[in-house]
Design a protein with these regions (language model features):
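A short, basic/flexible loop-to-alpha-helix module at the beginning of a structural domain
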Residues: 1-8
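N-terminal Rossmann-like FAD-binding beta1-loop-alpha1 element of flavoenzymes
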Residues: 10-37, 378, 382
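Glycine-rich FAD pyrophosphate-binding loop
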Residues: 29-54
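Mid-domain catalytic core of redox enzymes
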Residues: 31, 227-348
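Short catalytic/ligand-binding loop motif for oxyanion handling, primarily in non-cytosolic enzymes
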Residues: 45-47, 94, 100-101, 156, ...
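Dinucleotide-binding Rossmann-like beta1-alpha1 core, especially the glycine-rich loop
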Residues: 54-127
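Active-site/ligand-binding neighborhood in enzyme catalytic cores
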Residues: 95-99, 106-241
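C-terminal catalytic lobe of FAD-dependent flavoproteins
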Residues: 325-396
Length: 396
């Protein structure tokens, strides 16, 4: 229960023990401020939560590969864990035929048999020209037209269309063109999915990172798991002068301007008696008929597993409703208008509350962006400049 602690002893209430909330609490503790974190799940780390089973580090909410060009973020996270340098190399399965991702010379050879950049560029230009001719002088009106105008019909039909429609639960002709502003195309033989300088997986998983933040906080962070903020909302808001809220902003305001749209995910995991089920950490299924979007085989992230055992997880996108977890926002014009109403309400009615994170700001963040946004919030809250103390060997 919330009354387990004397709430008068805290400087901050933090709603949500995911990365944003945990970083803020840790940095507040370094500045002598005490925080109470309430988390509805039975554990910390949010969607980055990991656990070890059969010697395999399993990501409980989909594959999280850390990648960034931000050295400050990279140095910061490595205070708490060793990273293994893993680079994601995704394979796409379209009706039983395999292609490398992202789109690069390997993909083009698999698609068309082209062997040189000139041949691949000519093939793409030929297909783009046909697409632009069909459009006439107008701009693409939907995602399908946008994608074909950027990359051509072959790659769109086999590697984009089915995956995207499953991910969003909408036909590509019903999705706005701005979802795909550009497509990464490489005219080199390079399967490294993320084109970032710093990449890797924490050895032992992500949960330990936030456990170490707690252990290093000198008793200035308390966490109540299995505690739903909304069961105690009025009491907590009346007792805490400063709040960091990382949940859904529309839920905080009881959906008074309407529900924002989200996409949800469902995961099915299976232990298999094998040392190697699919030969790769991530395989995307890009056809429309396969109900899941990808299959993860976790042992390939770090090479660690008990002999003869592997664990796979299938990821199924699904419509969100209030009984499901919200994973990512649907940032179309309608939802943007609704979110702006909530953001204005937050500024005017609750200046004492910081709304942060992916759900609090109704914005998709990669992990490094969550860290960077948390740094920005800390700097604003405590009126400091660069004050994140860490040291690393720059050669790593």
């Amino acid at each position: 229960m919330v009354n387990k602690f004397n709430t008068k002893n805290y400087d901050y209430l933090i709603v949500g023990a995911g990365p944003f909330g945990m970083i803020f609490a840790y940095e507040a503790a370094k500045r002598g401020k005490k925080s109470l974190i309430v988390e509805k799940r039975p554990y910390i780390a949010g969607n980055t939560h990991t656990h070890v089973e059969h010697g395999i580090t399993v990501h409980d909410f989909g594959a999280h590969i850390f990648h960034t060009d931000n050295k400050e973020v990279w140095d910061y996270i490595r205070q708490f864990a060793e990273f293994n340098g893993y680079q994601n190399q995704v394979v796409a399965n379209y009706q039983g035929t395999l292609y490398n991702l992202p789109f690069n010379m390997n993909t083009f050879y698999q698609m068309w048999g082209t062997k040189t950049p000139d041949e691949a560029q000519a093939k793409i230009a030929e297909q783009r020209e046909l697409a632009l001719k069909d459009l006439g002088n107008r701009q693409p009106r939907n995602l399908e037209e946008q994608a074909i105008s950027l990359i051509g019909t072959d790659i769109y039909e086999k590697l984009i269309k089915g995956y995207t429609e499953k991910q969003w639960g909408r036909l590509a002709t019903e999705l706005p063109a701005f979802i795909i502003k550009r497509l990464p195309v490489r005219f080199i033989y390079d399967n490294n999915y993320f084109n970032h300088r710093y990449q890797g997986i924490p050895v032992g998983g992500y949960t330990q990172i936030f456990e170490r933040m707690l252990s290093q906080s000198q008793g200035l962070i308390d966490v109540l798991t299995d505690t739903d903020f909304f069961d105690h909302k009025e009491t907590l808001l009346s007792e805490f002068p400063r709040v960091l809220y990382t949940g859904m902003i529309d839920q905080f305001f009881d959906y008074q301007f309407g529900e924002l749209e989200y996409r949800s995910l469902r995961f099915e995991s299976e232990v298999i008696d094998s040392d190697n089920y699919q030969g790769n950490a991530v395989i995307n299924y890009t056809d429309a008929k396969t109900p899941y979007t990808r299959v993860m085989e976790w042992r390939h992230l770090d090479g660690l597993a008990d002999a003869g055992k592997t664990i796979i997880t299938k990821e199924y996108p699904q419509e969100w409703d209030r009984s499901k977890e919200a994973y990512y926002p649907v940032n179309n014009d309608k939802n943007t208008r609704i979110y702006k109403q909530y953001a204005q309400e937050a500024r005017q009615k609750h200046p004492e509350i910081i709304f942060g994170g992916r759900l609090g700001k109704y914005r998709y963040f990669d992990m490094d962006q969550v860290f960077n946004d948390a740094f920005h919030t800390v700097r604003e809250e405590f009126n400091v400049a660069a004050d994140f103390n860490f040291a690393h060997d720059d050669t790593k």
